[in-house]
Amino acid sequence: MGVPAFFRWLSRKYPSIIVNCVEEKAKECNGVKASVDTSKPNPNEVEFDNLYLDMNGIIHPCTHPEDKPAPKNEDEMMVAIFEYIDRIFNIVRPRRLLYMAIDGVAPRAKMNQQRSRRFRASKEGMEAAEEKQKIRQEILAKGGILPPEEVKERFDSNCITPGTEFMDNLAKCLRYYIADRLNSDPGWKNLTVILSDASAPGEGEHKIMDYIRRQRAQPNHDPNTHHCLCGADADLIMLGLATHEPHFTIIREEFKPNKPKPCALCNQMGHEVKDCQGLPREKQGKHDQFADSLPASEQEFIFIRLCVLREYLERELTMASLPFTFDFERSVDDWVFMCFFVGNDFLPHLPSLEIREGAIDRLVNIYKNVVHKTGGYLTESGFVNLQRVQMIMLAVGEVEDSIFKKRKDDDDNFKRRQKEKKKRMKRDHPSFIPGGQFSPQALGNRSSPQAISNPRQTAFEMRMHDRQNSTMSSPNTSLNSDGSPSPARGIKRKSEDSDSEPEPEDNIRLWESGWKQRYYKNKFDVDASDEKFRRKVVQSYVEGLCWVLRYYYQGCASWNWYYPFHYAPFASDFEGIADMPSDFEKGSKPFKPLEQLMGVFPAASGNFLPPTWRKLMTDPESSIIDFYPEDFAIDLNGKKYAWQGVALLPFVDERRLRAALEEVYPDLTPEENRRNSLGGDVLFVGKHHPLCDFIVEQYKSKNTEPVDMPPELCYGIQGKLTPNENAVLPDKTVESPVPMLRDLTQNSAVSISFKDPQFDEDFIFKATVLPGAKKPPPVLKPGDWEKTNNDGRPWRPQLGFNRDRKPVHLDQSAFRTLGHAMPRERGMPGMYANAVPLGAYGSPYTRPLMSGQQQIPKLLSNLRPQESWRGPTPLFQQAPQRTAGAAPLLAWNRMLPAQSQYPPGQYQGLGGPMSYPQRPEDRMDRGRQAYGPGRPYLLPPPSGRYSWN
């Protein structure tokens, strides 16, 4: 979604919506990895019914990852996608339905954004390749050492678009994957799987929402179904709220900024391409055994609990003394609608509303102040009341001028603080501090040595700094009156106040008077006094707001509508919108896949199109050559970076495009015609599913007509089933489209075409909670907790899905022991991470173990709940006889789980119970005393350095 900072703002404002996922890792024995049994209870202590996968959010990171080497070929990409789905399935473990949705042909309103993204990706890819080649030649000319350039074809991510051979092959691979899991994985035993590939029109997340809406409208639908949607787009949160399902959770990757990446030239860590010096690669390990290994950093996942977000919104949106009855569900719909003004995939955001400036909070406050005058809510089941929206927007327009001035003041203050900070740091720090192995270390850190990483790079930086110092102190360098060296003659001294990066030119200057005239003149090339044009822009934007809300709540209102401008109007221009029409043409049809490719692809990606179609992009005599500019301008629009700007691409004229394609349609081969046709969804079940026999019977009877799906056999799911060609059938071999994977010779799964329940075009899906739905128990601290809490118990926040989870504690000696095994300073390498992984203590609501933490469960093997501890383990069980050559016995790491009630006469010191009198000298020498009588258990050493000899 077009709100890059929306999730960051949401997670900071409503922190309790986030829960870290618990993932059960596969165990490895003798080099063989045993798969996880997903039929067992979910380790997150919650059971999900349906899992929906927005597949494009999986395909992109698997085909061109940013934090690890990319797959070498298409087969490896498919395997990476399979493994990613396995991870998500292992975490969520759905019990009823798995719905995989790949983006199909998008509405025309979305195609403009897709076109901008793909043109940018092509342009940035070529520019990056040229810059890389330029830097490579410069380094080699200076005598630098670089690995030989690997000759390989660059993966064009634009192929992840409906109609390409890649997407067609992906659909085949996913059908094979589903059949394989239904045959072999016990967690898939009773699961219904629906695959909506790229041939089915619609965006992936909206196909999922359309399925949920249509199933909710059925009488057999379970109103307490627990949904889990996988995807990283911010609009999934709004879509989940729009369903009004009380049990809705989103799972997504946890965003971690500034991940280390290898240099694209020398493949070494620690610098970017622009800073590469072409230094020889350091030996990694004694025998260079770690040469090709990158720092292990497996992606982690988080849950977003929309039920908790609803709790937050209920507190924030509840209003008293309204002239009408307060309805929380309607207020949630209004909140979703107001978020559209900040940005979305179909409309540019209003100039005065920035998510980073608290625009949503500002809108909510105005909404709560004005709603008493409006006489009702802004929306109802996806339809907008424009008269009430006009009151909100004009209220925003009244403060637009102050918003722009405050934005300028905040920006100037930020720059001033940054300059002062740089000056202060330059004054308070020495001119040069060596880093890496040469950096000065405190005496207390000698017990935690830091690994040497790329010392040649560090030595090079030190030599360069020495040269600069020698230049400054050379005889040709004159001295100022205060004795400081001054630059040599002929060299222009850099201003101390100059910024390292030039500021983009802003011709609009929204903080100065006349901003509206300058805006319309620069952005639309019209005078602000042209009231007719301004009203046209506002009307198009209002149509867009109505179209987007209808898209979220009722489905696509029109496949052909789009916003025909690059920029949005001002909020103060929303006058007289109450009488503007907001109806859309009925019966519109989506583009065909190859037609969409012609509408969104640049000429550089024309190799994914048939030859004669490709020629229309490059032939100077082509009637649509103007749709494919080789270069285009990017308007920063007041922003700092190019990716934040607006790509000024010409809009595609659908009439001209179709007229040009009529001449080349006869050139399509049968295979291309098949890829150019629109398809539907496919349903899969295994042999143990109650629906399996019913589907097999349809094939045996050779029935070709659609039949109603029996809801009693499939958890209330309804729809139409139709036998299809090339179906997966029992006892029929399923050939593997990936050469490295085996064929399924003993298949027992079956597939059939599936179509959602159909409704009249004028049918309205009600945006409300269904009868019989049970509200989840509250998670947030009650506002009257202090008044109603009579026993004085402190409020214990809920960290996971289960409020009744009993916490397990460690005593102080256990934490001290962990402190010995871990580095003292943050950021220093060590065997373990600095944060104690509570997941090893039996808590299912903590982050899974990272690669460096896998040994901690071994250190905590004797961990027991507090109630069951009956004293220390006998000495002979903890200290078995060591043999020569054995690994160091970490018996002192046997830790006690909780602070216990010690027997009388025992001293409770920092390390736990002690059965001997405590003296100051004993405290100092305690860790160096040998085992002896009166000491029933082992004690930890005094520091991380422990001599076992």
Curated annotation (Swiss-Prot):
Belongs to the 5'-3' exonuclease family. XRN2/RAT1 subfamily. It is found in: Nucleus, Nucleolus. Disulfide bonds: none annotated. It comes from Gallus gallus. Possesses 5'->3' exoribonuclease activity. May promote the termination of transcription by RNA polymerase II. GO terms for cellular component: aggresome; nucleolus; nucleoplasm; nucleus. Keywords: Exonuclease, Hydrolase, Metal-binding, mRNA processing, Nuclease, Nucleus, Transcription, Transcription regulation, Transcription termination, Zinc, Zinc-finger. Its main location: nucleus. Residues 783-794, 919-928 have a biased composition (Basic and acidic residues). A zinc finger (CCHC-type) spans 261-278. GO terms for molecular function: 5'-3' exonuclease activity; 5'-3' RNA exonuclease activity; identical protein binding; RNA binding; transcription termination site sequence-specific DNA binding; zinc ion binding. Residues 438-452, 469-484 have a biased composition (Polar residues). GO terms for biological process: mRNA processing; nuclear-transcribed mRNA catabolic process; spermatogenesis; termination of RNA polymerase II transcription. Pfam families: XRN_M, XRN_N. Its EC number is 3.1.13.-. It comes from the Eukaryota. This is 5'-3' exoribonuclease 2. Residues 410-452, 466-507, 775-803, 902-949 are annotated as: Disordered. The keyword Disulfide bond does not apply. The keyword Transcription regulation applies. Residues 416-427 have a biased composition (Basic residues).
